[in-house]
Amino acid sequence: MQETAFIWDLDGTLLDSYEAILSGIEETFGQFAIPYDKAQVREFILKFSVQDLLVQVAEERKLDVEVLNQVRAQSLAEKNAQVVLMPGARDVLAWAEESGIQQFVYTHKGDNALTILRDLGLESYFTDILTSQSGFARKPSPEAATYLLDKYQLDSEKTYYIGDRTLDVEFAQNSGIQSINFLESSYEGNHRIQALADISRFFKAER
């Protein structure tokens, strides 16, 4: 399966990090006296993104979104220890490596993602790790995928973006690559999973 490539999302896919993210947002909101509703915030960031949330709040409250971002990034960095692996994450990464599948990361997380992956002993699985600070347009723009496809001469029909949100499926579709996702989608290139262990089963069945 040498021609196969995986591009991974992190939050909610490889990393069980939403509690740490929500806690960081709560602290940030508290510093600026912004009301915090955990259920509403969770629903919003799953549908859109944390950045979209901060932009909206900054506009509503006449705040500087960059300041909000800095406070949140600092708060989140202090919560790295709360971030754990999703069930089966290490196993599927090891299986992919043993199967000759090239692996990459494209995440909306900042460079703190590198620290987390290093701390969890996962960094060596990836050929390249792109974060929100790598300079690419945010998902669902295909810019980051196009960069990886070109730089590493990847086959778009055998390259999969693995994520947990509709935004991730849209990113794969816009990029002309396959999608593996925890959600159903009308995109014919999407393959739904319920657990990370389903990925190796899917590829073994395809052989």
Identify the meaning behind each predicted range.
Residues P35, Q102, Q178:
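Residue-level detector of anion-binding/catalytic polar loops
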Residues I45, S49, P87-G88, H108-K109, ...:
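Short beta->alpha linker loops
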Residues M1-T4, G30, E66, A94-E97, ...:
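Asp-based, Mg2+/Mn2+-dependent phosphohydrolase catalytic module
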Residues L14, L85, V105-Y106, Y161:
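Conserved SAM-binding loop
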Residues W8, Q103, T159:
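Short glycine- and Lys/Arg-enriched binding-loop motifs that mark or flank ligand-binding interfaces
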Residues Q2-P87, D91:
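N-terminal helical cap/lid subdomain that shapes the substrate entry/recognition surface
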Residues K79-V84, H108, A137-R138:
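Short, flexible loop segments at the rims of nucleotide/cofactor-binding pockets, characterized by
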